[in-house]
Amino acid sequence: MLGNLALALGPWSVRLADCGPVSSAFWRLTLALPLLALCARRAGQPLGGFTLRGWLLVAAAGVLFALDLASWHLGIERTRLGNATLFGNSGSVILMVWGLIALHRRPRKGEWAALAFALGGAAILLGRSVEIGTRTLTGDLFCILAGFLYTFYILLLQNARVRTGSWPLLFHATLAGAPVLLGIALLRGEPVMPHVWWPLLVLALGSQVIGQGLVVYALRHFSTLFIGLALLSQPAVAVLVGWFVFHEALVPIDFLGMVLVGAGLVLARGSSGSEAAEPA
């Protein structure tokens, strides 16, 4: 729950940063590296000891995580915070579908319900974004892409996690992802150096160290259904921040879309805790 709450405040920090959206993602990773190394040391988890396959998996995961963050931060800049958080967490449904494909079986009732709720809610939210403007719709699509990329990032981390602890995994994935984000920011012509550092420090500490660290830790200690229920705290906090800080008022149809997507995510998490999650 604490990890999800920390992650929920990430979009607020992205909006407040005075550098570009991809640049803020670069600083999120770069500033977090010393803290991640310290956490690994205090946990007694050495940063080395990976096999060649392990190094390759973690490096690939880091690249996917960088692309996920770039896409998500671009989406946060364009769409409403509630939409950005829900669509950015759409990996639960994508992971469930991946598991069904890997198992070569048809969805069960709960899985059909997860798909129906998620797709129905997404259609409502995307329709509302079309009404608001093209920029908002583009932001939604960036966040959905981020959900796809985050799914495969988690799949690679789960494969690499077998012989090592959570902190070394997160450290090396972060180390691999930072240069990718810097390259994208420079190609986009974004300002990289900020004038005000505190939003980036909050982003690095809250999202990358506390948020990501606790979520990766929770993968080992809690059921996917529990994680899915805790996940709902993210969009709830993001909606409140968007409403009170950025004046992103919602109408009843927005709440309906968000509830449907949230229900789909929880049902998908519950499904991935059984057969659907086994191939990962």
Language model segments and positions:
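Glycine-/small-residue-enriched transmembrane alpha-helix faces in small-molecule transporters
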Residues: M1-F26, A60-V63, L67, S71, ...
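Specific transmembrane alpha-helical segments of multi-pass solute transporters/efflux pumps
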Residues: A6-L7, P11, A43-G82, G88, ...
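Hydrophobic/aromatic residues within transmembrane alpha-helices
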Residues: A17, S24, R28, A59, ...
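Transmembrane alpha-helices of multi-pass small-molecule transport proteins
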Residues: C19-L67, I94, W98, F148-L156, ...
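Loop-to-transmembrane alpha-helix entry segments
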Residues: R28, L52, T85-G88, H104-I124, ...
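Hydrophobic transmembrane alpha-helices of multi-pass small-molecule transport proteins
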Residues: L36, A40, A59, F65, ...
